[in-house]
């Protein structure tokens, strides 16, 4: 069995878990956002909401800059419209997610050039942001039972729901195999030393959750997005249940 963390910025193909790639799902087609054309409003918005651009860090690879851009953009959008962010976070795959993202993403959070992403990527970036914001200091843990991702997927066709559910069940397995490492990866900054260590540490947990004899290619963003989603859903449900007692 071989596990490879691929240095590919925006690829979402993992053969052993999800046979259907994002590229074959028309509802997850790439969206491109350009800066808002109203300069005065953009400047006002930028100072208030910290609109972002591609990071100009010579130490970061272009691939890492792309990963960081999605999370930075998601952070700005989350801060400016928490209600919209929650609608994206809670949307199931397919058309519901695309509609939520199209209504939510806007050029007021992007300063220069353009940013392109799939709806599933922006949702993943939002899960990173939301989990960090609420649970950076400590993971609340996991519910005794896995999340029902079939219910979240809803009534979309099997070609979409199968890969969606399989990937998140894979994430559940990784998180239960080593919660501390999953948490460390979810809260680490893009391309930081902490993230590099976390990716190294998480490899053994990934291996536990892949069938023997299979070779799997996992992108860094896919692992980070999936673990952040799994941890966030468990953490918020745990927090809600404790609040009701």
Which role does the model predict for each range below?
Residues 1-7:
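Sec-dependent signal peptide recognition
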Residues 13-15:
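N-terminal signal peptide c-region/cleavage motif recognized by signal peptidases
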Residues 19-128:
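N-terminal Sec/ER secretory leader and immediately downstream segment
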Residues 65-71, 78, 161-168, 175, ...:
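Short, low-complexity cationic-aromatic patches
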Residues 78-102, 177-214:
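Extended intrinsically disordered, low-complexity coil regions enriched in Ser, Thr, Gly, Ala
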Residues 121-190:
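Extended amphipathic alpha-helical interaction segments
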Residues 196-245:
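A cross-kingdom marker for long, charged
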């Amino acid at each position: 069995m071989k596990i490879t963390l691929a240095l590919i910025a925006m690829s979402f193909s993992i053969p052993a878990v999800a046979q259907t790639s994002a590229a074959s799902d028309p509802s997850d087609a790439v969206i491109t956002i350009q800066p808002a054309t109203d300069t005065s409003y953009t400047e006002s918005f930028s100072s208030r909401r910290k609109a972002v651009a591609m990071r100009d860090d010579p130490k970061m690879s272009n691939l890492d800059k792309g990963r960081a851009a999605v999370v930075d953009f998601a952070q700005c959008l989350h801060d400016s419209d928490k209600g919209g962010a929650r609608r994206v976070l809670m949307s199931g795959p397919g058309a519901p997610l695309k509609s939520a993202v199209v209504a939510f993403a806007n050029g007021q959070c992007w300063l220069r050039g353009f940013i392109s992403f799939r709806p599933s990527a922006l949702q993943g970036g939002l899960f990173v942001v939301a989990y960090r914001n609420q649970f950076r200091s400590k993971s609340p843990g996991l519910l005794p039972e896995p999340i029902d991702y079939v219910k979240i997927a809803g009534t979309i066709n099997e070609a979409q729901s199968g890969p969606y559910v399989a990937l998140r069940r894979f994430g559940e397995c990784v998180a239960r195999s080593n919660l501390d490492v999953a948490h460390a990866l979810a809260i680490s900054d893009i391309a930081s030393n902490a993230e590099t260590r976390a990716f190294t540490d998480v490899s053994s947990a990934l291996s536990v959750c892949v069938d023997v004899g299979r070779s799997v290619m996992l992108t860094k963003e896919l692992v980070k997005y999936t673990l952040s989603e799994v941890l966030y859903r468990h953490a918020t449900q745990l927090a809600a249940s404790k609040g009701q007692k």
